[in-house]
Structure formats: structure tokens, C-alpha cells
From Swiss-Prot:
Keywords, comma-separated and alphabetical: Pyrimidine biosynthesis, Transferase
SUPFAM superfamilies in the cross-refs: Aspartate/ornithine carbamoyltransferase
Sequence positions that bind L-aspartate: K92, R175, R229
Pathway(s) where this gene product acts: Pyrimidine metabolism; UMP biosynthesis via de novo pathway; (S)-dihydroorotate from bicarbonate: step 2/3
Gene Ontology MF: a single term: amino acid binding
HAMAP family in UniProt: Asp_carb_tr
Protein name: Aspartate carbamoyltransferase catalytic subunit
Length: 315
């Protein structure tokens, strides 16, 4: 299979959704559509990255994102290396900059990086010659998650512009929320964040979103309900009285889903905490797109890898 799309991303790295134009996003989504179809065929291989080296460098635990990037790279023909941080020099006191310079000396073409500190991926990108993809940095951004969410929405609703998207839960600690807000605003959606005051960033309205502090108001008229998990690993205090009380007020069950439009669809970036932010009946119900999001993730990451590879020397 040869891509029909001639889209070239005018960036060396993908560090965030911020800085991407609507045309950039549309180009990546259109290219992703080709990979959705390819991934449903028996032969899923392409040779776009043949001879290229992709290093996955994850400083935080990941199941979906890391395995998705690994599969994407291999299906495109790359030599993929997963670097284990638990056994790396980082654990022995090496700085991130030294790690970047060491890796750069091995001439990787693409680095896929997840790090617990906001801005760490951008710092690393300044020190390497290849392309860098942000697979999530602290509470800052997670660009490929926002892209796969956008692809999922577009395939099911036919558009993004004009839709009402309610992002519910722990917005304060969520890089997924930030990237989605930027992308959805860029593409003309109407974005609403929903959650208790303790889990909403101060001044979030400045990002161009509506704010609701209860689910009835927040889900009213929503086309898409995007749930977020409580990110306890980023919390250094008590943000909710208890998980059971949180579920009573902000967990998505069938009753609360009824506040949204009758044809509203449910999304979640995973991993889910069933019975905390989402009820099993909703997560596995007919309005759920959660499994489809995982499928779209591989296609989007293949598209991002190809788009960046087109900018590499001798591409």
C-alpha cells in the first residue's frame, strides 16, 4: 500500500497540539484514515520507515500508548527499540540531557518519549538530531491521544466543528484534557469542562471553554461525553472526599448520561477506573467508543510517524 495522502507536517517534532493548525490536524486525520483501513487487512505492513530506527523511551508506565507506538513503528517497517528506564542509566543518576546526548550518538531517527515532568520532552528534543514525539509529559500535553480522539469523533459524527464536547473529571492533572481542549477549539467544537472546583485548573476559562461544576449542567446538550480518571499519582493532597462520593456526583452512569443528547457518545482515554469515574454499564454500552479509541490509536500513530518521516534527511 502506498499513501494517497501527500500531506507533509511542517514540523520536525510533535511536541504538542499547540502550534498545529487546523490544516495540520486535518492532514494527520486524513492520513490516519488510510491506516485504519490498512490495519483491518490481513497484510498490515508498509515500508515507510524501512531502514529507520525508532526508540520508545518511557519514564512512566504505559500499556496502550507504548504498545500502540511499538506496533505502529513495526507495521511501518522501522527497527523499534523499547528502552527500559528501570534498568537505564537514569536510575543510576544520569540526567535527562546526558541520556538524550547518549541516545543521539546512536543516531536514532525518531524518539517517542513519555516523561513525568512537564516540558521534559521539549528539553530532550533540543538535544537530538532526529524527530521527537511527545507521548505524554506530566500534566502538559498528550498530542497523539487528542488526535486519536478527534479521529474517533469525526468517524462517528462526521465532523468536529459545532459539536458540544463535555470533558469530565480530573481536568486539573490531565494532559489529555489540555491537548483535547486545544485541538477541539482549533477545529471549531464547543468545549465544556465538568468537575468539582478542586479538580478544575484556576482560570481554565481562558482556554476558551465553558465550565460546569455538576453533571446535569455539564452534560446538557452534549454530543460527546469524555470521561477522565482521577490521577492519584499526580495528587499530593486530598482532592475528593472519597471515591464513592465522587462517583455519586461525577461518575458517569446511565442516569447522568441521560442529561446529554440522546445520540451522545462516550469516550475515555484509559485506563478506566470502573465505579469511580464511569459505570461498567456505560463503559461497555452501545454509546461507548472506548474500544474504538484504542483501534484509532494505532492508525494515528502510524500517520504521525509517516508524516514526520517525510521530513527526515533522505526521506
Amino acid at each position: 500500500m502506498t499513501s494517497k495522502s501527500t500531506f507533509v507536517l511542517g514540523h520536525r517534532h510533535l511536541l504538542g497540539i499547540e502550534g498545529l493548525s487546523a490544516a495540520d490536524i486535518t492532514g494527520l486525520l486524513d492520513l490516519s484514515e488510510e491506516y485504519v483501513e490498512l490495519n483491518r487487512q490481513v497484510d498490515k505492513k508498509r515500508t515507510v520507515l524501512r531502514g529507520r530506527t525508532q526508540v520508545n523511551l518511557f519514564f512512566e508506565a504505559s500499556t496502550r500508548t507504548q504498545s500502540s507506538f511499538e506496533l505502529a513503528g513495526k507495521r511501518l517497517g522501522a527497527d523499534v527499540m523499547n528502552m527500559s528506564v528501570s534498568s537505564s542509566s537514569i536510575k543510576k543518576g544520569e540526567t535527562l540531557v546526558d541520556t538524550a546526548m547518549t541516545l543521539n550518538a546512536m543516531h536514532p531517527d525518531i524518539l517517542v518519549v513519555r516523561h513525568h515532568a512537564s516540558g521534559a520532552v521539549e528539553l530532550l528534543a533540543r538535544k537530538v538530531d532526529g524527530s521527537v514525539i511527545n507521548a505524554g509529559d506530566g500534566a502538559h500535553e498528550h498530542p497523539t491521544q487528542a488526535l486519536l480522539d478527534a479521529l474517533t469523533i469525526r468517524r462517528n459524527k462526521g465532523r468536529i466543528e459545532g459539536l458540544v464536547v463535555a470533558i469530565c473529571g480530573d481536568v486539573l492533572h490531565s494532559r489529555v484534557a489540555r491537548s483535547n481542549i486545544i485541538l477541539l477549539n482549533t477545529m471549531g467544537a464547543r468545549v465544556r469542562v465538568v468537575g468539582p472546583s478542586t479538580l478544575l485548573p484556576p482560570g481554565i476559562e481562558r482556554m476558551g471553554v465553558e465550565v460546569a461544576r455538576d453533571m446535569r449542567e455539564g452534560l446538557n446538550g452534549a454530543d460527546i461525553v469524555m470521561m477522565l480518571r482521577l490521577q492519584r499519582e499526580r495528587m499530593n493532597g486530598s482532592f475528593v472526599p472519597s471515591t464513592s462520593e465522587y462517583f455519586n456526583y461525577f461518575g458517569l452512569d446511565q442516569k447522568k448520561l441521560g442529561y446529554a443528547k440522546p445520540d451522545a457518545l462516550v469516550m475515555h482515554p484509559g485506563p478506566m477506573n470502573r465505579g469511580v469515574e464511569i459505570d461498567t454499564a456505560v463503559a461497555d454500552g452501545a454509546q461507548s467508543l472506548i474500544r474504538e479509541q484504542v483501534e484509532m490509536g494505532v492508525a494515528v500513530r502510524m500517520a504521525v510517524l509517516e508524516a514526520l518521516a517525510r521530513n527526515l534527511p533522505n526521506a
